Design a protein with these regions (language model features):
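C-terminal catalytic core of tyrosine-transesterase DNA break-rejoin enzymes
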Residues: 1-5, 75-80, 94-118, 125, ...
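Residue-level marker of regulatory loop/turn positions in helix-turn-helix DNA-binding domains and
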Residues: 68, 90-91, 115
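Phosphate-coordinating loops and pocket residues in cytosolic domains that bind phosphorylated ligands
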Residues: 8, 16, 125-128, 143
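C-terminal catalytic core of Y-nucleophile DNA break-rejoin enzymes
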Residues: 26-46, 56-78
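Conserved tyrosine-mediated DNA breakage-rejoining catalytic core shared by Y-recombinases
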Residues: 1-49
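C-terminal secondary-structure termini that scaffold catalytic or DNA-interacting sites
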Residues: 46-50, 54, 62-66, 121, ...
Length: 147
């Protein structure tokens, strides 16, 4: 999900029973359903139980004004500094997600759908295969072709 989609998310668009988030306002203007899996589901469920929110409430409200989304700048910068990572923006997580999906066998269509891209060209722009992954793929192909 994009940062704006996350920060603008309200509880009425979170379906814990079916483990999914429905994004109504997206960058490309198309409604998108995002599955809530593993750790993300657990974190969102626990947050819901803790806050007991109303439908229109933001999932991540500002502590100063619950009608406004929280600012993540300070937390992001602190996390990046602690992890000793340089030159990494929140948006770069989308590139990482696309790359990990590709390296774990997701099709271009699946990656496009998960990231909310309309074109496969955008998927290509976001997906970056590691050198190790490319070597592994070539090794697999060589074993099949040459035994």
């Amino acid at each position: 999900m994009r940062r704006g989609e996350i920060l603008g998310l309200s509880w009425e668009n979170v379906d814990l029973q079916n483990r999914r988030i429905t994004l109504v306002r997206t960058k490309n203007g198309e409604r998108r359903v995002v599955p809530l899996v593993c750790k993300a589901y657990e974190l969102i469920k626990n947050l819901y139980l803790k806050l007991e929110p109303e439908g229109k409430d933001l999932v991540f409200p500002s502590p100063n004004n619950p009608k406004q989304p929280i600012s993540i700048r300070t937390a992001w910068e602190t996390a990046i500094k602690r992890a000793k990572i340089e030159n990494f923006r929140f948006h770069d997580l989308r590139h990482s997600t696309a790359s990990y999906l590709a390296m774990n066998g997701a099709s271009l269509l699946e990656i496009a759908d998960i990231l909310g891209h309309k074109t496969l060209q955008m998927v290509k722009r976001y997906s970056h295969l590691s050198e190790d992954h490319k070597a592994t793929v070539l090794e697999k192909m060589n074993k099949k072709v040459f035994g």
